[in-house]
């Protein structure tokens, strides 16, 4: 009766462990060593952790670990970058479609960006002239330009209508 009561009490309170033959090596506060937990592994599971001395991979000397990762661009990206920097190079890049504008040997946005820069410079010049106080001359010139553009648009419209009929 007492032995049955002791068994039921020991199962109901797992905190009060008494050393037995199966767990003589482990006491309540200690944990099993790393080799017991990992089994019979020769090397640690992580490649980022340094290797242990008992793995036997490189003898008795400690191994120097390098954690630097070097990323390299794919070859066609590097060639494309070099071709964009060197304007005399004629390298055909197969990843860019020819329908994107121009030939595959030329950058597609060269003419567009040049026009954009020239337009921007002209607008900045006009703003600078207006800011400096010569607004009367610039305003008269801009009004004349607007009148000429309207006349040109009307002439083009008449030509289109004449060709249509």
Swiss-Prot record:
Keywords: Cell membrane, Membrane, Transmembrane, Transmembrane helix. InterPro entries: DUF4658. Residues 1-47 are annotated as: Disordered. It holds the Pfam family DUF4658. GO terms for cellular component: plasma membrane. Induction: Highly up-regulated during 3T3-L1 cell differentiation into adipocytes. In vivo, down-regulated by fasting in both white and brown adipose tissues. Reduced in white adipose tissue in obese animals. Predominantly expressed in white adipose tissue (at protein level) and brown adipose tissue. Also detected in heart. It is a single-pass membrane protein. It comes from the Eukaryota. It is found in: Cell membrane. Residues 34-43 have a biased composition (Basic and acidic residues). Coiled coil: none annotated. The keyword Magnesium does not apply. This is Nutritionally-regulated adipose and cardiac-enriched protein. It comes from Mus musculus (Mouse). The gene is Nrac.
């Amino acid at each position: 009766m007492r032995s049955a009561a002791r068994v039921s009490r020991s199962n109901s309170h797992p905190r009060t462990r008494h050393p037995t033959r199966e767990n003589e090596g482990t006491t309540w506060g200690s944990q099993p060593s790393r080799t017991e937990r990992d089994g019979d592994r020769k090397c640690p599971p992580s490649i980022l952790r340094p290797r242990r001395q008992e793995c036997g991979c490189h003898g008795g000397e400690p191994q120097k670990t390098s954690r630097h990762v070097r990323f390299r661009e794919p070859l066609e990206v590097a060639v494309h970058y070099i071709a964009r920097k060197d304007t005399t190079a004629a390298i055909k890049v197969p990843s860019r479609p020819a329908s994107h504008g121009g030939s595959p040997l030329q950058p597609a946005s060269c003419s567009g960006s040049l026009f954009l820069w020239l337009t921007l410079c002209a607008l900045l010049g006009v703003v600078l002239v207006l800011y400096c106080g010569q607004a009367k001359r610039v305003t008269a010139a801009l009004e004349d330009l607007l009148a000429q553009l309207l006349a040109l648009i009307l002439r083009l419209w008449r030509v289109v209508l004449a060709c249509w009929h």
